[in-house]
Structure formats: C-alpha cells, structure tokens
C-alpha cells in the first residue's frame, strides 16, 4: 500500500523514486532500503500468483469468454529484460490480467510461452475459456499450446507463412490473399497454415480504409529510425486473421472488431514505460527479472485503483 501511494505521488516506477516518496517519517536512505527489501522479498515472489489469482477472479467474474490480449514489450533495453503481458480488453484501456518479466534471450521462446500459459491457466477461474488475441509475432507453436489448454486463439498472419486447402498440398504464400481483401470482412473457411508445422484453422480477410495518417517524427531526432517504415507497411497491409473459433460462434465482422482491440495493450505499455505519459518504468535500472516482477505488481495495484 505504501509503495502504491509513493508511486501515485512520484509517477516514476524506480526503486529510488519510490523510496524518496514513501509517506513515512524515516530518512530517505532508510526508505530506499525498505523498497529494496520489498523487491527482493522471496516470500512475495512465491505469493505473487495468489495476488494475480484474486485479481483475475475479480475482473473475469461474469464473463466466461474474456478477450485476453497478449504481447511482448521491451521494458528495459539496457538491462535486456522483456515482459510478456496478458490484458483483458475492455472499453478504452485494457486491464492487465497477468505479466511476467523474462531475459531478452527467452523472448518468443517456447519455454517462456509455455511457462506463461501455465501461470495464466493457474490464475484464471475454472469456468473461464478465454479468447487469446495476439499479433503476427506469435506463431504455430503458440497456437498449439493455447489449444492444448482448451482455449481459443485469434492472431494475425504475416510474412512468408504459407497456406493450403484442407487435404491438399497446394501451398501458397499468405500474401497471395491480399488482392482478395476489401473493407468488408469475409471468411475463407478452414485452411492449413505453415507447411513445416501445419495447423487447421479458419482464415479471415479484411482491409481497412486509409486513415490518411502522416509520420510526425521529428526531423532532428531519430528521423532515420526504421520503425516508422515498418509500422507503416504493417498498417497498409490487409489483415489476414487466423483463429480456431468455430465459424458459428463469431461472424467475420465480430472477429475483426475483436482483433482491432489489440491496440489497447500497446496503450497500456506506454502508460507503464513512458516518462512523459506514464510511470517511467523505462528509467528503472533493476536487472533481476524476479525483482522486476514485483515492480510490475506495484504498477498493477495502482492501475486497478485508478480503474475502480
């Protein structure tokens, strides 16, 4: 509670800033040591899932199929730490359901994904069957791991991925479908994805109308950064969506609307990392993934307080 109060006052999620703003009469150096002991508390590390379990029962109550957005983010580039987060899509900002820090070397690895899904399964209510929404960075091994839990998944497919008709070997690049897309979403029925590790799923197509957005990046700073070109190409490219949801459960238009909520998780990442618009976690020099997990838990408690 004191750490959340300090974060609300200083709006900077670092060890020293939390210590400097603790609402106690102790000297600053003792408050900083107090936060340091909190981040290194092994008992709290073990009980962390119990907190998320209580949190999940609260925000998922009454919804047997929550829309869960999942994505990676480079929280601390200098310390080479990544965070994998699951958020429940709501009106406006999504609310974090569960998140865990991993070393950069484990980003997008099957080991990290399986551990994350196992933790997520342990905190969700038993009567819940979530729809996991992810971007094109998640591949077939992720889809199959989600299916093993009896859950549904919805993901975008890009790049050199191939598809084929069921029972046939007529493999073609997924980019061949782009010319068939329009502003009216449609389903192509069930197809097979990836020749090396095939999976059967429903394929959908959609191309949104141009929004006329222009690059506003400064011409003096980072003007040659490659990210605007990458994001622009992704935004202009039609959506090829894949899902294991039965055709009769959701219409193509409903599935497109669900996937469009994925940007909510990007907004909450900015709320957490940005020094200008959020909690400034990017300035943290914490190098331990376990200690980072506690900092994420403090941020979640503040987010939940503001959401309520």
Question: Model segments located where?
Answer:
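Single, function-defining residue in the core of a domain
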Residues: 1-13, 50-51, 63-66, 79-80, ...
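Electropositive nucleic-acid engagement tracts
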Residues: 1-2, 6-62
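Acidic/polar N-terminal loop/beta-strand segments that form early-domain functional surfaces
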Residues: 21, 38, 71-73, 89
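Two-metal-ion RNase H-like nuclease active-site motif
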Residues: 65-75
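Short beta-strand scaffold segments in enzyme catalytic cores
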Residues: 84-87
């Amino acid at each position: 509670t004191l750490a959340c109060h300090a974060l609300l006052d200083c709006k900077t999620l670092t060890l020293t800033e939390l210590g400097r703003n603790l609402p106690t009469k102790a000297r600053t150096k003792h408050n900083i040591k107090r936060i340091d002991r909190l981040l290194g508390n092994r008992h709290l590390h073990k009980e962390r899932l119990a907190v998320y379990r209580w949190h999940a029962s609260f925000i998922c109550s009454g919804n047997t199929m929550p829309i869960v957005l999942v994505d990676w983010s480079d929280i601390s580039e200098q310390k080479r730490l990544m965070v994998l987060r699951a958020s429940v899509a709501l009106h406006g900002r999504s609310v974090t359901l569960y998140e865990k820090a991993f070393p950069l070397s484990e980003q997008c690895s099957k080991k990290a994904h399986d551990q994350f899904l196992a933790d997520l399964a342990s905190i969700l209510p038993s009567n819940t069957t979530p729809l996991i929404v992810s971007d094109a960075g998640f591949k077939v091994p992720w889809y199959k791991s989600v299916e093993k839990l009896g859950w549904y998944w919805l993901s975008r497919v890009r790049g050199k991925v191939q598809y084929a008709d069921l029972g046939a070997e007529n493999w073609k690049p997924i980019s061949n479908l782009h010319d068939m897309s329009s502003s009216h979403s449609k389903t192509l029925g069930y197809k097979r994805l990836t020749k090396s590790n095939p999976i059967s799923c429903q394929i959908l197509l959609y191309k949104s109308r141009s929004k006329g957005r222009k690059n506003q990046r400064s011409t003096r700073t980072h003007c040659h950064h490659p990210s605007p070109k990458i994001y622009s190409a992704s935004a202009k490219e039609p959506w090829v969506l894949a899902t294991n949801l039965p055709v009769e459960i959701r219409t193509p238009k409903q599935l497109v609307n669900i996937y469009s909520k994925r940007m909510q998780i990007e907004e909450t990442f900015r709320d957490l990392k940005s020094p200008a618009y959020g909690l400034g976690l990017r300035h943290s020099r914490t190098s331990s993934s376990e200690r980072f997990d506690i900092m994420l838990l403090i941020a979640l408690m503040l987010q939940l307080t503001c959401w309520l």
